Each structure stands twice: as C-alpha cells, then as structure tokens.
Amino acid sequence: MNIYDILDKVFTMMYDGQDLTDYFLVQEVRGRSVYSIEMGKRTIAGVDGGVITTESLPARELEVDAIVFGDGTETDLRRRIEYLNFLLHRDTDVPITFSDEPSRTYYGRYEFATEGDEKGGFHKVTLNFYCQDPLKYGPEVTTDVTTASTPVKNTGLAVTNPTIRCVFSTSATEYEMQLLDGSTVVKFLKVKYGFNTGDTLVIDCHERSVTLNGQDIMPALLIQSDWIQLKPQVNTYLKATQPSTIVFTEKFL
C-alpha cells in the first residue's frame, strides 16, 4: 500500500517541474508570511529619535518540514534520499510552487537540510531553499497599446517591468513609447532606426535590452530614454507611435 492511499488530501510541492511529494510528505512551509523590510538606521547624538537611511527587501528563505518515505524498508529509503539529492541540487534558480498557492511561483534553489529522526523507513528533515528574488510571480498579462493614451493596469501587488513588442505596419525612422500624466510626457523610450514594414521590435524593460527581428540594436536607443515600470493597482497611461503590445508578469510579496 502506498502512503498516499491512507491520506485524504496531500499538500504538494513542485520544484523545477518535479512533484516532490513523490518522495516526501510536506508537514509545514515557513517563509511565506508577512514579509520583513531591512532598514539602515542611524542616530544623531543629542537628537531624539533616529533616521532611516536605506530600505530593501531581503532574500526570501523557504523552510520545508518534510518526511521522506520509502516502501517501508531502510534500503528503499536510502535510494529515495539519493535520488532526492539529485533532484534538489541545482546551480540556477528554478520555479517552486505549492498547492495552496496554485497561481504563484517562487524562484530559488535548494541550499541545505537539517536532519531529524529516522525510524521504520521514514526520515524527518527540514529543507531550506534560498530565493535571491523575494517576490513571487503570478500570471503573464498582455495588453494592447495604441497611438492614443491607453490605460494599462498592473493587477499585481508589486512594481513590474514590462516588455514592449511592436510589429511595424508601415516603415518608420523611429519608434517611441511614452508614459503620460494627462497630456504631459513623464518618461519615454525612443529608438531611432530604419524600420521596415513587418519588422518586430522588442524592448525588454526588465533585461534592459532592445532587439529588432531578434538582433541586438541597443545602441539605437536614445540616451535620454528612461525604462518604464508599471506601478501596482493603478492605471499607467501609455502611448506609442505604432500599435504595440505590452507584456508583463504580475508580482507579489
């Protein structure tokens, strides 16, 4: 009999596309609660209170209490732990998801384990995962932007950096995406280049790259340009010189 045959509902964890509940039962996950802020502070002699000098979000650390299981024999348990080591060790951040947050993805990698008791083919362990990026990611959103002021709403709960994509319907000598406050241009991205009909321009505000038909044309981006960000839960008004598409990923803390 498989251990899952006696359980009504199983909490699942996916790591780099692999369902780890094939190897262990999750008891508890820590590191997903109200998030802390790291503050740099200083005081001035003779002055009441203090001064906050810096603020930042620390890396996220996920702790997973688990019970590794086999078929009831110590030999099978050892083999499963060997294979679990193979699955966990990664040299890049990978997607991590939990069944109680089906539309959220963390990105991190396994760091270390704290061993617990082992008895009767079961092994208790706490697995620690280090997420350089403290944010978790939701679905990807695609919105069209026209040559008139267009509202784009970031429905996430954190600032996100969009990717702009334009397939040129006519030839042009420049492309511009503007961020507006009423009729005022707050910031813009402008690319001066000889664009032909059918060319595909991609401006990635996260990677800070500009490509045309897959080729780098970063030098064509005007130095006065400023990368566009979408603030959470509000409309950002954008306007383009050619019909374009904005793609962004919702982010959460």
Swiss-Prot record:
Q: What is the annotated localization of this protein?
A: Virion
Q: Name one GO biological process term.
A: symbiont genome ejection through host cell envelope, long flexible tail mechanism
Q: Which Pfam families match?
A: Sipho_tail, SPP1_Dit
Gene3D superfamilies registered for this protein in UniProt: 2.40.30.200, 2.60.120.860
Q: Note the InterPro entries from the entry.
A: Dit_BPSPP_N, Siphovirus-type_tail_C, Siphovirus-type_tail_N
Its Gene Ontology cellular component terms are:
virus tail
Q: Which UniProt keywords apply?
A: Viral genome ejection through host cell envelope, Viral long flexible tail ejection system, Viral penetration into host cytoplasm, Viral tail protein, Virion, Virus entry into host cell
Subunit details: Homohexamer.
* Task performed by this protein: Forms a 40 Angstroms wide channel at the distal tip of the tail. Remains associated to the tail after DNA ejection.
- NCBIfam families, per the entry: phi3626_gp14_N
The protein depicted here goes by the name Distal tail protein
